[in-house]
Structure formats: structure tokens, C-alpha cells
Amino acid sequence: METVNVKEVIGSKLATSSDKGLLLYEILVEKVSNNEPVTVDFSDIKTVIPSFTNKAFGKLFDVINLTEYKDLIRYNEDINKIFMDCINYSIENSTTKREQYKAEMNKMYQEIEEQNA
């Protein structure tokens, strides 16, 4: 399993922007798209904010589901609990929004079909 060091990817100890999150996302999406497991290493990272984790992790749900995520993405064992909370918040937010969107789209398609029947 390959390890991706966040500090090396973003060039900083501060994971504090969506642009930096996108840098990590681009690596992770390539791995998960090829069904390659990866460990994300937050060693030496001092700060993580939701805009970073939303882009780096939440956006992955455009291409994989939660089961695949759990199978493919791991974190360094000593990851900061606050960082993990931030990641989990982004995952929950992303999956919930996608479920709501899917339900709304299904409802809209059903209404269109009923109107055309």
C-alpha cells in the first residue's frame, strides 16, 4: 500500500485551503480510480480545516462510494483526532448531500414521467 505524505503534497504544514485540498484529491482520485489502496499520512501537519478536507476527501464521492472509500483509504495510525473529526465531517457532509441530490433528481424525473404519461 502506497503512503501519500500530505506535507510533501501540499508543500506546507498547514492544510488550510481548498486549493491545497485539491492537490491531495488529484493524487487520491487517481489511486481510488485504479482501485489502489493508499495511506494518507498527516505527519508534521499542524492545522487542517474543512475547506481542505472537503476538497481532498469529500470530492472523492464523485467517483467512489462509502464502502469503496473505507476499503481504499487509510490514515497514519497517530493521526490527530481533530484532523480525523474534520475528515469525517467532510465525508458525512458529502455523502448526505449526494443522497439528497439523488433523491431530489429521482423525484423530479418521476414528476416529468407522470406529466408525460
Please state what every model-predicted region is:
Residues 44-52:
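Acidic, metal-coordinating catalytic cores used for nucleic-acid/nucleotide bond scission
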